[in-house]
């Protein structure tokens, strides 16, 4: 960590929409750097995975974060959905790896509990708290809100690990 603090890219993977958000922490103060979503077009699944990879690759090259935090895949409506979600997550992690970015993974319930205090919080509650923590108006979509939550969760967990280490 430099005197400029640490910058974390949070990612909420999805085959239709992959949210991303970049949060910087300096002396315990969180600042929103940028956020958005990669929305692949087309029916060919491999093309969508490529779009996720390239979209995040561009975000990382533009903002040069120090670390990344990616929401883990635990549940889906069915096995096929879980597989697609896992592949989208793989494309996101590969984009981070191409930039030698350390990647942390957190379960959705862990992220929600860190941000809202409840592991089963609704997406709207998460977005509301993310906006409050960042001191901004939260006019992003749910995927971007979840990505920002993943970044904040990682910053909080990092701080706790440093405190525990003494």
Swiss-Prot record:
Predominant location: cytoplasm
Residues holding Mg(2+) 1: 12, 143
Short name of any one Pfam family annotated for the protein: RuvC
Known EC number: 3.1.21.10
UniProt similarity note: Belongs to the RuvC family.
GN (gene name): ruvC
Role, per record: The RuvA-RuvB-RuvC complex processes Holliday junction (HJ) DNA during genetic recombination and DNA repair. Endonuclease that resolves HJ intermediates. Cleaves cruciform DNA by making single-stranded nicks across the HJ at symmetrical positions within the homologous arms, yielding a 5'-phosphate and a 3'-hydroxyl group; requires a central core of homology in the junction. The consensus cleavage sequence is 5'-(A/T)TT(C/G)-3'. Cleavage occurs on the 3'-side of the TT dinucleotide at the point of strand exchange.
GO cellular component, one term: Holliday junction resolvase complex
Assembly notes: Homodimer which binds Holliday junction (HJ) DNA. The HJ becomes 2-fold symmetrical on binding to RuvC with unstacked arms; it has a different conformation from HJ DNA in complex with RuvA. In the full resolvosome a probable DNA-RuvA(4)-RuvB(12)-RuvC(2) complex forms which resolves the HJ.
Catalytic activity line of the entry: Endonucleolytic cleavage at a junction such as a reciprocal single-stranded crossover between two homologous DNA duplexes (Holliday junction)
First-level EC class: hydrolase
Protein name: Crossover junction endodeoxyribonuclease RuvC
